[in-house]
Amino acid sequence: MHLGDLKHPNELHGLSPAQLEDVARQIRERHLQVVSTSGGHLGPGLGVVELTLALYQTLDLDQDRVIWDVGHQAYPHKLITGRFNDFDSLRQQHGVAGYLKRTESDFDHFGAGHASTSISAALGMAMARDNHGESFKCVAVIGDGALTGGMALEAINHAGHLPNTRLLVVLNDNDMSISPPVGALSNVLNRARLSPPMQFLSGSVEESVRHLPFMGGEIPAELNRLKGSMRRLAVPKVGAVFEELGFTYMGPIDGHDIGEMVRTFQAAHREGGPVLVHVVTKKGKGYPYAEADQVGYHAQSAFDLGTGKAIPSSKPKPPSYSKVFGQTLVKLCEQNSRVIGITAAMATGTGLDLLQKAVPDQYVDVGIAEQHAVTLAAGMACEGLRPVVAIYSTFLQRAYDQLIHDVGIQKLPVTFVLDRAGIVGADGPTHQGQYDISYMRAIPNFTVMAPKDEAELQRMLVTCLQHDGPTALRIPRGSGEGVPLMEEGWETLPIGRGELLREGDDLMIVAYGSMVAPALATATLLEEAGLSTTVINARFLRPLDQALIHPLARRIPRVVTMEEGALPGGFGAAVLESLTDQDINVSMLRIGIPDKLVDHATPQQSKEALGLTPAQMAERILERFSNTSGDLPASASIKALQA
């Protein structure tokens, strides 16, 4: 069978072991071929090929529900549910998404991108099923890293209290999330992983008893009670944990042995309540480079299949904002033992891997636990430490109550570095950092800022650590502007003071963070069109530099704000509210991300689709103000000027 000809995943039912091995080979080949060409998540999907095939052998995918936690390990699922031939478009604009989307396939029952949501969703579906009197199966597949998230543990706590609700949780245990998982639960899983494979009465022994002539296919109550007693004696410590929480535990089993998994899943489906099957897999299975470096090959840009090495870009790039942040924090930690870097399982992505290597005693990884990370930092600050919490903008959303309740209200000196703020590209709407401006500006006592370049990032980090109160600093994904950097001796910035970059009389642009450089480029185009333009680097969202902005707004009749974030409640709204409160009436245009989701594409494609390139913004400015003011200079279009 060629997977390109597969019409429905149920067609895989009844394939021989040899045929299933061939299907597994095709999945890995296609997975590697596409990701090596266009980039994407590599290790997670390679590790669950056999798990996916075995699980789907035991399900009717016309009706049963499978919820994949996070979704980056679901490439094999996509390849056998109708997307094999279109997989070349993975993570590309208008192509196959890198995560699961309910709008993409009827087999994608629940969308995701953040960790630890699958058990809650699957339990909700199971409860709805029972409410409707239906009988389909509900399965959550979750990794050992995601299992450490509080939401997953909350769902397990609830499901274990519902002994008659059929739910299967498949624990994909590869001893990894993006980085190696941390914590006591991870240690327990590791000990179970090293124990001999367990054979339970609910598996092969039960099958033998069921087929005895005098049993008639039924398992008497006495044997069921014996089975429960034997299981409690036999399961490893991790199994005892889940058993005490109300789950039937099976495992650990080999996650690359299709036959063993099929038998175990079949036994699990026969149970009448919540079941957890513990499956041990190898991240990156089948590709030696990914098996050897499971962190580095979690996700990859384009790479050479033969050597495993990344294909270099056509020209050198400046260091990323994340790297500059990490390098600067290392220096600051070396100078001050009270400074502590905290990550929630994203050390490499945020640049804190540099701190982990250089000053490990001042580095903390809490696992996938953003809420805990924030309040842990609050506790540290109470006792005189200066914690720096580095979290992606999209993931900090998960700890909003802690930002307000535990840090903001108490005015604690915790610094938050919001990485991947703004448009992030191919990961799509679950990962865009478009909301942090709106959600951070609403929290009292916070000082919130964003640098125009990587040198200003260094000064802002020092400013945060010397400020007696909570601070937040947003940085974009990708390379900096290529400006010179200082090794040390960074000066602080005055809190709430912006920067006047150029002066003009016709128009004022107030730009925030990553939009400062595009604002300057836009101003150049407007000058060529005859529009004299002032440009301000706002630097601070809270407090806004009213002393700089207000006098200029009284003199300049047109104001444009630029931000790489959501317009509702955003930076432009802050400027507009500030002007309105002082009865400063101007013609205004707010440029940013409109009230919509930003789908997967390259960052440049997304910016073009949103009208955020300098040429597009200049055109829009001319169009906006030529409709409201007759005194603008006549000019050709920006496109014509660029030609």
UniProtKB/Swiss-Prot annotation:
It catalyses: D-glyceraldehyde 3-phosphate + pyruvate + H(+) = 1-deoxy-D-xylulose 5-phosphate + CO2. The keyword DNA repair does not apply. Its cofactor is Mg(2+); thiamine diphosphate. Binds 1 Mg(2+) ion per subunit. It holds the Pfam family Transketolase_C. Keywords: Isoprene biosynthesis, Magnesium, Metal-binding, Thiamine biosynthesis, Thiamine pyrophosphate, Transferase. The keyword Transferase applies. GO terms for cellular component: cytosol. GO terms for molecular function: 1-deoxy-D-xylulose-5-phosphate synthase activity; magnesium ion binding; thiamine pyrophosphate binding. Thiamine diphosphate binds at residues 72, 113-115, 145-146, 174, 287, 370. Its EC number is 2.2.1.7. PROSITE patterns: TRANSKETOLASE_1 (PS00801), TRANSKETOLASE_2 (PS00802). Pathway: Metabolic intermediate biosynthesis; 1-deoxy-D-xylulose 5-phosphate biosynthesis; 1-deoxy-D-xylulose 5-phosphate from D-glyceraldehyde 3-phosphate and pyruvate: step 1/1. GO terms for biological process: 1-deoxy-D-xylulose 5-phosphate biosynthetic process; isopentenyl diphosphate biosynthetic process, methylerythritol 4-phosphate pathway; terpenoid biosynthetic process; thiamine biosynthetic process. It comes from the Bacteria. Mg(2+) binds at residues 144, 174. Catalyzes the acyloin condensation reaction between C atoms 2 and 3 of pyruvate and glyceraldehyde 3-phosphate to yield 1-deoxy-D-xylulose-5-phosphate (DXP). Belongs to the transketolase family. DXPS subfamily. PANTHER family: 1-D-DEOXYXYLULOSE 5-PHOSPHATE SYNTHASE-RELATED (PTHR43322), 1-DEOXY-D-XYLULOSE-5-PHOSPHATE SYNTHASE, CHLOROPLASTIC (PTHR43322:SF5). Homodimer. This is 1-deoxy-D-xylulose-5-phosphate synthase. It comes from Synechococcus sp. (strain CC9605). The lineage of its organism: Bacteria, Bacillati, Cyanobacteriota, Cyanophyceae, Synechococcales.
